[in-house]
Amino acid sequence: MKPDAQHVKQFLLRLQDDICQTLSAVDGANFIEDSWRREAGGGGRSRVLRNGGIFEQAGVNFSHVNGDAMPASATAHRPELVGRSFEAMGVSLVVHPRNPYIPTSHANVRFFIAEKPGADPVWWFGGGFDLTPYYGFEEDAVHWHRTARDLCQPFGEDVYPRYKKWCDDYFFIKHRNEQRGIGGLFFDDLNTPDFASCFAFMQAVGKGYTEAYLPIVERRKTMAWGERERSFQLYRRGRYVEFNLVWDRGTLFGLQTGGRTESILMSMPPLVRWEYDYQPKEGSPEAALSEFIQVRDWV
């Protein structure tokens, strides 16, 4: 099967619709849509749910950009892309709940293809999902990783362990020497064994996100919380901001190549705080988080 960008685009548009409808049904609030065009080619649909019953902010973004040539920053490490037109498309989302006992979640699936006459296209898929709890619950982490493992199973026994490790390695905040959360799946440059298999895997990851996340939301949404939990949640959200602005390749690439800033920064939490030399009280649930987010085999 030859790479079919149009087929991928239709799936991504449906995936954005499905995820937004599912999150709206859980929350009770609706997304607002902001459609945009990119002068250099392409555009997208940014959707945001704000101040909902459960989600303080949820952003679900679809983008499809194209051009006659790749920027020099992208071809420096990939000389085979020089002189090719390209298309890049994907769905990216981040959900920031209000209740500190519900973790923040992030998911992304994407496709890239570069073509020139008389040559085979260069293409690959990427994506994944990861979870960032503020208070650790083992059953939530096990469910998240079991869902990830089960969706990987049809594609090979080594797929889950490989992409789990990649996720743990990627979502590491080097300047803090700590994980961003408990990980999940992360893959990139996927183009073997063939287009159909890779596309099927990307679809499984995209659809698997809500199956992994929503049972956790349902389990935690009625838990009572107060000022202490909220203060800790806002402090830990600072780590999310630090990772995205300092280390995340997608954020940096988007900002450095003239991407749409509002859509790129849609992943930012609406409220966040920093505190100099914060130390949680010994033996407290807040202190337990640093141990909980250590890399381990959850399933």
UniProtKB/Swiss-Prot annotation:
Catalysed transformations (reactions)? coproporphyrinogen III + O2 + 2 H(+) = protoporphyrinogen IX + 2 CO2 + 2 H2O
> What are the binding positions for substrate in this chain?
S92, N108, V109, R110, G258, G259, R260
Site residues (Important for dimerization), renumbered to this chain: H175
Question: Which coenzymes or cofactors are required?
Answer: a divalent metal cation
Q: What is its EC number?
A: 1.3.3.3
Residue positions annotated to bind a divalent metal cation are: H96, H106, H145, H175
The answer to whether the entry has keyword Metal-binding is: yes
- Lineage, top-rank taxon, reads Bacteria
Principal place where this protein is found? Answer: cytoplasm
| Region (Important for dimerization), start-end ranges | 240-275
Q: Which InterPro entries match?
A: Coprogen_oxidase_aer, Coprogen_oxidase_aer_sf, Coprogen_oxidase_CS
Q: What class of enzyme is it?
A: oxidoreductase
The record, for PROSITE patterns, names:
COPROGEN_OXIDASE
Q: Which SUPFAM superfamilies match?
A: Coproporphyrinogen III oxidase
User: What compartments host this protein?
Assistant: Cytoplasm
Q: Where is the active site?
A: H106
Q: Which UniProt keywords apply?
A: Cytoplasm, Heme biosynthesis, Metal-binding, Oxidoreductase, Porphyrin biosynthesis
Kindly list the GO CC terms recorded for this protein: cytoplasm
What protein family is recorded?
Answer: Belongs to the aerobic coproporphyrinogen-III oxidase family.
Chain's role: Involved in the heme biosynthesis. Catalyzes the aerobic oxidative decarboxylation of propionate groups of rings A and B of coproporphyrinogen-III to yield the vinyl groups in protoporphyrinogen-IX.
Subunit annotation: Homodimer.
Which PANTHER family does the annotation name? COPROPORPHYRINOGEN III OXIDASE, MITOCHONDRIAL, OXYGEN-DEPENDENT COPROPORPHYRINOGEN-III OXIDASE, MITOCHONDRIAL
Q: What is this protein called?
A: Oxygen-dependent coproporphyrinogen-III oxidase
Source organism phylogeny: Bacteria, Pseudomonadati, Pseudomonadota, Gammaproteobacteria, Enterobacterales
